[in-house]
Structures are given as structure tokens and as C-alpha cells.
């Protein structure tokens, strides 16, 4: 079967969920003050931002964001009379609401064993190994689930004085190392993270989903995390559609932290890490306009929605970030070829109005646009992996573990 689309561009608006998933009662956030566990059944990232702050997103509105099936309509994103794109929402079947699980399922994997988390912090023997390798002590009081901004507020001044490492975790399967760039260089931080990655792989006794380098700068009371973040992920446990495309000789482009999330597996061309989401759009545009990129697949992650606004429960900042992205959509559409396909989605929720600071278990929105499509409509609710199954069918490779293609529905 000949390709329907010469190029497919997949953009993940990290954490931009669109309402509680059917199994949200099994996933929890913890009240920051009382530590009470509250399930995610009332979470609704886009819905609550639209209601509390309001959203002025004319381009997403025209594409059909307001037409995505919901129990109640978005307050400030009205339905389009004739949406310019196919739209729907997708449900996650994997047993997790973290970045890796979401992206890996989008690329066709079914993760039924959740990645281990460490709510009590990391074991002493692991910390001792890191100390021995790095030659630096670790601040034990930080070794627990912590907000990334709060942990540097609380321990940054001490790190500036002593040079000790700040190692902390979250509700996600991550080990994060915060390092002030005046005390610990990025190069040293990355080397430490690479070591930690090497001793926490599957079968090592303590498996960790991602090791994250978190450099920051500034003075006490005014610390700021920089764009030097690096994620050191496990390699996917099975072959994803991204890897299948790569092995079939189809060009694959990574923008933002996609390459990190898949540990580079399946990525042919890495457009680099984003300084911020607007820089991420710039990098996507640079990939799309490369003369040699005539056929293939680009995969973009825009992380600021999640990292800067979702975890910090910043409704205003989150809404503004969505509007900023909406303002860039005409540029993306303008450089699309007639047979390009653009898909805009998310990987989980992170309702900035919700209790706690963790991700929320939500449906993700899906917008599917091409200049060649004649009759866009609302598609049935599907699953995350339907995206990769569609990509796979378009490029004549086998789908991964799960997912059903909707390629034939696009006319």
C-alpha cells in the first residue's frame, strides 16, 4: 500500500490532559500539607485551565479542540462549526502516568508492570556508591519525594557552601540530581548521572526509570533551574514503532527530550534539547524545512507545560504557555507540505489546579491535521498506541505491541 502521507509530525504538549481517565480512581496525588492521598477522578488539565483562567486559542479552536468528546464543553474554547482537523481523545492502558510510560505507549508498548518508585527515598547502599564515584557527600535530608524548586530553595544554600549533592525523587520513577553550576559543572553533573544510570538498569537490584540532571544558578532566595536538564532513561523493553521506522530506513527526527526518553533508540537525527517550548517549536520548524527531510517521521516534546507550570500548580503560567503555543501553530501549518500529517497530543495530565504536585491520570487530546484532508470529523475515543499504529501503517512497518490504526478514517 503506498504511503498516504510522506511525512508525519507528532507533537507532544507534555501533560496537557483533557479530563480524568476511567481508571483515575486508582491513581493519586498527595495533599502538600496534610499528605492525604486524593485520587485523580476530578482532574481535568485543559478543562480547569479553560474554566479558571480562560483560554484564548483561536488556532486550536479552529482545528477542533473544543469538539473533543467531553462530559461538559470547554468553557472558553467553543466548538468549531466545521473543524479543520480530525479530533478525539485517547485512553492509556499502561499502569503508570509518568513521562516514559506515556511516550512508550504512544509508540506502541503496553507497560503493565509499573516502574518502581521510591517514596521513602533511595537506599543507603546506592547513595554510598554515588558518593564513592563522585567524591562528594550527599545531603541525606533531601533524599525523598520533593518539588524540584522547593528542594533547591531548601538545600541550595548548603550546596553552595559544602559542594554536597542534592539527590531527590518524586512520585515518578526518577532519581534527580540538582547541582548549582558555580559549584558543580554541567560536565561533572552529567558524568555523575551517567554513572548512576549504569548501576540502576533492569536487573541491577535497583531499577530506576530515569536519572535526571537538574542544573541551576542564582543566589539563595532566587535560584533558577537552567536549560541544561538531561534525562538518562532506560531503553524501551521492546521494539517501538520509532525503532521499527529507523530499522526500515525511514528518517526519524527527535526534537526536545524525545531522544532521552527513548535512550536514543530509533532516533536518526536529534535536533537537540529545547531551551524552552518556543525554542522547541523553532527546532521543529528547522527540521520540517530541511531540504533532505522529504519523507519520514518527526517526534517533538514540549516539556514546559509540565515542568514549569503543571508540577508547580501554576494555572496562569500554564494557560499562557498553551496560548503561546497556539500562536505558533500557523507557522507550523505554513511549512507543512500537502501530504504532511500533523498530530498534536499529550502524554498524561498535570492539572495545575489540582491537589498535590504530581501528574494526573487523564485522557489525552489528539488533533490530526493535513492540508490534504477533505472532511475532518470527530473520531471514536481510542488508546495512546493508536497513534503509533497509524504511523506504522502509513510507512508499511509492523505495529508494536498494541494499538489500532485510524489511517483509513482520514479522508
From Swiss-Prot:
Q: Which reaction does it catalyse?
A: 2-deoxy-alpha-D-ribose 1-phosphate = 2-deoxy-D-ribose 5-phosphate; alpha-D-ribose 1-phosphate = D-ribose 5-phosphate
Compartments (UniProt record): Cytoplasm
Q: What class of enzyme is it?
A: isomerase
Would you name any one GO CC term? cytosol
Keywords from the named record? Cytoplasm, Isomerase, Manganese, Metal-binding
EC id = 5.4.2.7
User: What pathway does the annotation place this protein in?
Assistant: Carbohydrate degradation; 2-deoxy-D-ribose 1-phosphate degradation; D-glyceraldehyde 3-phosphate and acetaldehyde from 2-deoxy-alpha-D-ribose 1-phosphate: step 1/2
Protein name (Swiss-Prot/TrEMBL):
Phosphopentomutase
Q: Which gene encodes it?
A: deoB
Amino acid at each position: 500500500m503506498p504511503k498516504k502521507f510522506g511525512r508525519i509530525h507528532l507533537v507532544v504538549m507534555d501533560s496537557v490532559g483533557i479530563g480524568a481517565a476511567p481508571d483515575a480512581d486508582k491513581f493519586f496525588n498527595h495533599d502538600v500539607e496534610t499528605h492525604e492521598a486524593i485520587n485523580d477522578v476530578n482532574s481535568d488539565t485543559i478543562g480547569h485551565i479553560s474554566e479558571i483562567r480562560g483560554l484564548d486559542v483561536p488556532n486550536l479552536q479552529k482545528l477542533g479542540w473544543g469538539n473533543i468528546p467531553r462530559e461538559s464543553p470547554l468553557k472558553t474554547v467553543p466548538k468549531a462549526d466545521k473543524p479543520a482537523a480530525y479530533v478525539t481523545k485517547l485512553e492509556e492502558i499502561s499502569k503508570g502516568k509518568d513521562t516514559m510510560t506515556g511516550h512508550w505507549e504512544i509508540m506502541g508498548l503496553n507497560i503493565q508492570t509499573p516502574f518502581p518508585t521510591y517514596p521513602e527515598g533511595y537506599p543507603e547502599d546506592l547513595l554510598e556508591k554515588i558518593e564513592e564515584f563522585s567524591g562528594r557527600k550527599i545531603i541525606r535530608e533531601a533524599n525523598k519525594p520533593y518539588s524540584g524548586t522547593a528542594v533547591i530553595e531548601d538545600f541550595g544554600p548548603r550546596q553552595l557552601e559544602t559542594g554536597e549533592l542534592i539527590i531527590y525523587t518524586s512520585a515518578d520513577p526518577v532519581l534527580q540530581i540538582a547541582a548549582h553550576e558555580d559549584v558543580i559543572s554541567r560536565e561533572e553533573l552529567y558524568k555523575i548521572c551517567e554513572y548512576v544510570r549504569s548501576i540502576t538498569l533492569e536487573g541491577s537490584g535497583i531499577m530506576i526509570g530515569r536519572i535526571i540532571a537538574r542544573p541551576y544558578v542564582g543566589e539563595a532566595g532566587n535560584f533558577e533551574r537552567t536549560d541544561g536538564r538531561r534525562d538518562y532513561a532506560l531503553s524501551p523493553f521492546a521494539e517501538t514503532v520509532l525503532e521499527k521506522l529507523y530499522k526500515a530506513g525511514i528518517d526519524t527526527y527527535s526534537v526536545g527530550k524525545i531522544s532521552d526518553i527513548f535512550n536514543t533508540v530509533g532516533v536518526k537525527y536529534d535536533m537537540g534539547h529545547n531551551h524552552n517550548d518556543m525554542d522547541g517549536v523553532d527546532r521543529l520548524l528547522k527540521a520540517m524545512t530541511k531540504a533532505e527531510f522529504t519523507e519520514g517521521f518527526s517526534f517533538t516534546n514540549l516539556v514546559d507545560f509540565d515542568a514549569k507550570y503543571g508540577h508547580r500548580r501554576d494555572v496562569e503560567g500554564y494557560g499562557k504557555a498553551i496560548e503561546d503555543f497556539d500562536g505558533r501553530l500557523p507557522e507550523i501549518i505554513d511549512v507543512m507540505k500537502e501530504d504532511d500529517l500533523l498530530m498534536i497530543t499529550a502524554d498524561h495530565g498535570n492539572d495545575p489546579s489540582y491537589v498535590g504536585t504530581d501528574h494526573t491520570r487523564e485522557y489525552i487530546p489528539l488533533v490530526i491535521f493535513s492540508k490534504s484532508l477533505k472532511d475532518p470529523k470527530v473520531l471514536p475515543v481510542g488508546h495512546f498506541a493508536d497513534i503509533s499504529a497509524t504511523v506504522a501503517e502509513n510507512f508499511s512497518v509492523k505495529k508494536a505491541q498494541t494499538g489500532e490504526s485510524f489511517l483509513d478514517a482520514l479522508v
